[in-house]
Amino acid sequence: MDCISTKNNKINKIKFSITIIAFILLYYLIPLNYRDLWQPDETRYAEISREMLQNKNWSIPYLLDIRYFEKPIFGYWINSISQFFFGHNNFSVRFGSFLFTLFSANLIYLFSKKIWKNKILSLNSVIIFLSILLVYIIGTYSVLDSIISFWINLSMISFWLASTSKVKKYKIKNYIILGISIGIGFITKGFISLLIPFISIFIWLFLTKININKTIIHCFFSLLISILIIFPWIYKISYLEKDFIRYFIFIEHIQRFIGENAQHKSPFWYYFPIFIIGCLPWSGFLFSTLNLAWNTRKNKKIEFYLLLWIIVQFCFFSISKGKLPTYILPCFFPLSILIAKNIEKCNLKNKKKLLKINSIINTIVGSTLLIFIILHEKYKFFGCSLYNKNEYYKLILCIFSIFVWIFLNLCIIFNDFKFWRITSLSIIGIAFLFGLYVPEKIIYAKQPQLFIKEVFDDLESSDFIFSNNIGLSTAISWEIKKNNIFIFENKGELEYGLSYLDSKHRFIKKEDFKNWLSKNKEKKISLVMLLPDKHYNWKKFNVPETKKFFQHERLILLKYNF
């Protein structure tokens, strides 16, 4: 009888876990289309892939019809294929990120199940991974980090399976997969796909002393396979664009990671708060999980391997000069497996202390955020409120979404932690509603699609369009499906591409703009600008005056010869 009861209990846990995963997938998928694209990242990747699809140039990335060598090609292929199948919409722009997040979740399930032969533990790992805040944000946001993270994850898994396999056939298969994942990772985001796995692997080999010489030889076999994958594209783009290799290696890698003038320069400790906050709603397990993996490192090699995977990547990006929150995404793959294992141990020992701490932390975080937003709207701590007077419905939605976070965690506490998996639904309110309560002052600066739709007819009928912001330029180009936008005053990330002789004419300084206008009196010209603030007088840009203009918050359209 006890055996039947235990079996039924296990089946119920599996069903409940699958139901939770289904809910999580819903709050990944549904918001993809109705949230406006963010500039500069999402509008950039949307436009590069649109132009690639339009021009059928599958080798050289172009942005606004200007060379753009910041990233390799694979991510753009994925986004172009997505746009081909799903059309010209926000869903297709973000689908690649969602898809590769799902691939990583599937890897977690298969890997956990192979290691521990425990279906419930494997499903718990997936639940934790998909509901981690930073994983969710990046998985519903169009950047290349979800894609490169998948290839890094696959590299690390395939090495473990290859190095621990006793069967020669499976060993060879996994070393081949290691080579493939490094190769495709390279044409997704460059040398990072090679550096992260190999640094992690060599440190692991050095510390464990497991067949070092033999394993290094096998890794060189994987490296050869990766070169075979990388070579065709590298050869073609190097043949067509002679300066690509120099720019890609020295500017996009050496300068980005160790150069004094690196992009997104931040201090060493930058990732510590991001790692803790990004781990929500599971941050309460973070330190105990890492500590447990460290304490069992001598007799539990897989847990030490997963811990080392986290530490090496975290330290690598912390040491690098250039930093963005998205870079540490691969750390959350092994972390979610370790957290699931930690929770299983708590349940087996009937210790609910960690579950309690985690739910209390979530309740405190939610309550603090809720109180801060309410008080900020009342007392305007930073000189102005988050929402305008006509946006109180957005404030209500914002408060409600945070209240859902608090309510679910209180339910877990008062139900004696039987339904701890509901923790994964903490962000469900924010996930579904966030796109509906973004303040206007942010929309009309960072999400320009709405403004572009308001002036769409003017832009579409323009003979020439100028913009002083690259993110805004790419948003205009994406919306009106024209890629010949002129860059006004600020070259931004297109500085390198604009240095080419065939693209120099696409940049106009503000002191030359008046003269350019006088030479094109018969043409309809639009100048779209992002202002420093909504009260900034656009005339300070020293552009010719016009009575035909439209402004909303920080975005303004100036019309000439209309």
UniProtKB/Swiss-Prot annotation:
One of its GO terms (cellular component) is plasma membrane. The gene is arnT. Catalyzes the transfer of the L-Ara4N moiety of the glycolipid undecaprenyl phosphate-alpha-L-Ara4N to lipid A. The modified arabinose is attached to lipid A and is required for resistance to polymyxin and cationic antimicrobial peptides. One of its GO terms (molecular function) is mannosyltransferase activity. InterPro entries: ArnT_tfrase, Glyco_trans_39/83, LipidA_mod_glycosyltrf_83. The lineage of its organism: Bacteria, Pseudomonadati, Pseudomonadota, Gammaproteobacteria, Enterobacterales. The chain crosses the membrane at residues 14-34, 91-111, 120-140, 142-162, 186-206, 215-235, 267-287, 302-322, 324-344, 354-374, 395-415, 425-445. This is Undecaprenyl phosphate-alpha-4-amino-4-deoxy-L-arabinose arabinosyl transferase. GO terms for biological process: lipid A biosynthetic process; lipopolysaccharide biosynthetic process; protein O-linked glycosylation; response to iron(III) ion.
